[in-house]
């Protein structure tokens, strides 16, 4: 297709400016001078244009120029196509824009490339997805020294097409060394592994944890070329932690190259010393914990039945002290208040650890990265994250282990105020309760406070520094006194013993804590998309009932203040804006007409699933299936985004119709 003369001139000008900026002419002169020198030295034939182009290609100059010349695709041509053609291959619905990274030449980098995947035998029988067909996908998440990365999703297969690279900065945290390029000896002392978390997303959008692996990267320090290839075997999680789920072919490269490499003997010696040091610290803590437990049982034999949890298993079934699951976590500018942090934790999905077969509850306290990447977990995962965030906000926070109704084991969070006030935080709902103890020795005529919280008994409390077991005569929460400094009521563990195995860097086996990531979701776009999908679903549902549907866009818009008010109340505990909402609805509904509204809250963005849930409510079904004179329907969706792709989705269905009775 020929360009108009003015467009051709403009294009030539752009190319000329780009070539001038890149100093391509200077590079050509250098290559030409070099080629002429080689020609005179070899006394060959006259240098041709082909020889010059060959030399330019060999030096990568042609490729460099072509990469710099970007031409934007005309979007208008795509917008004219009303019905897109079916895809002939898997399409990533969330395409990632390639961003240029500012590489600091004074820092050392580890380039981790995932070249391919093999032996994912669970997907051996799966055929390639048909054109336009939705398929399950794998996503790989990485964390290394406060840096987080996420691969593009690839279709699940026996040999998934993983082809991703991640540039990890290798640096020291200590002041003074942070700005200096790390040498081989310094990097050998950095025992932080690269944590890999593999997720599977099914066709309905549900995410499950496939594997959690800690990659030891320091073997690259002993290679002369600064690069090494590894075969990483991924094991399952929970009860399948001994079963291989697949293999990743990984390549590690250091940039820039090391001036001096280390011998493999030195590297192996360092690994051995770290393992021995870790094993000895863990052994000493275990010996201390056993002695502490014997002392606790000697106080009162009935203590044996209390929920005093010292160790917990992670997703790889590794036993770790519960205090190691907590660490003060600052959310930067992603969360502004402790209550907003509680709301964020509340909207993360709740899912009990999966089990194979029947029996009791499967225990699995996930590492923080696995919990955040999956965006759902058990109540212990929620409590550990909430406690860490509250500690980051400067509160004196603890995780409580006990029971709620019917003796079911449960965990929640407690904060102790400077004035002695005790507040309970329910991580799964975001609710807060003030604790006022009941004195069982008071006479019957004395009015006692009625507890509003659902908790029945408490066995222990802990955070990253302290672990205390309840040694009061009764373990009922309502009569407990939470004076944690009173050793006659709370038996403490040695803070030094806890620090030896739970403080950052104390042992090599301690998983590092990742930072929170901001949401990549666009709230307005998501709200519009879900609302349109719900309108289609309502239309189809009423059509099946033989009913016509007329939407009232103005009424739909007027529902927005109510949804905003509900979210503010969930976040702050303060109800606001209800008077204005009632006033505008009264004005929008004429005399003699009836208005009905049904709000509902979700923590997922699946419109079909949400609609099915709404229909199970008789009141909502009455609105959606409403019959009447001048009947108008309305629906409003509002998505509130939080860190880590978490979101609160508020939906409100409403109708107005003329009363004929």
Curated annotation (Swiss-Prot):
It is found in: Cytoplasm, Cytoskeleton, Microtubule organizing center, Centrosome; Cytoplasm, Cytoskeleton, Microtubule organizing center, Centrosome, Centriole. Pfam families: CEP76-C2, CEP76_C, CEP76_N, CEPT76_peptidase. Keywords: Cytoplasm, Cytoskeleton. InterPro entries: CEP76 (IPR052299), CEP76-C2 (IPR028926), CEP76_C (IPR056288), CEP76_N (IPR056289), CEPT76/DRC7_peptidase-like_dom (IPR056290), Papain-like_cys_pep_sf (IPR038765). One of its GO terms (biological process) is regulation of centriole replication. Its main location: cytoplasm. Signal peptide: none annotated. Gene3D superfamilies: 3.10.620.30. One of its GO terms (cellular component) is centrosome. Centrosomal protein involved in regulation of centriole duplication. Required to limit centriole duplication to once per cell cycle by preventing centriole reduplication. PANTHER family: CENTROSOMAL PROTEIN OF 76 KDA (PTHR46436:SF1). Belongs to the CEP76 family. This is Centrosomal protein of 76 kDa. It comes from Xenopus tropicalis (Western clawed frog).
